[in-house]
C-alpha cells in the first residue's frame, strides 16, 4: 500500500490522500472526511516533473516498462527487481495513468517473480487497463499472467 501511495505522490506531483483499506462504500458521505483531504509532502512540486517524465519515457519511448503501454493513455511506470539470496528475485512495478490528471496509481510486488517486467508489470498493466477502459484488449498478456509460475520455496532455516 505504501508503494502505491508513493506512485500516487509522484503522479499528483507531491500530494497524497491517507491510504486506507475499505471494506465497503455506502455512498461518498460514508467515508471519513480525512480520507478526502490532500496532504502535501515537503518536496517542491517542480522536482516531480523529471521523475514523471522519466517514468513516461520508460513506458512510451524505451526501457524495461514498454509492455505497460496502453493505446490512448499516457502511462507512466517503473520496474524494479529486488534481489533475493534465497530464491528468485522479487518483481516490482509502480505505475500511474494518465500522465496528467491521473486517475489510477498502482504498485505490484511479486515475491519470487523475477525481473520487474516479467511478473509485476503485466499484472499491474492489466489491472490498470481494466480500470481505465473497463475491458482487457491484450488477451496474450492476460494468458501470460494466468500462466505465470510464481512459486514460494520452502526456505531453509
Pin down the residues of each PLM region:
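Active-site beta-strand/loop architecture of penicillin-binding DD-peptidases
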Residues: 1-39, 46, 55-138
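Short, highly charged C-terminal tails/helix-capping segments
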Residues: 138-157
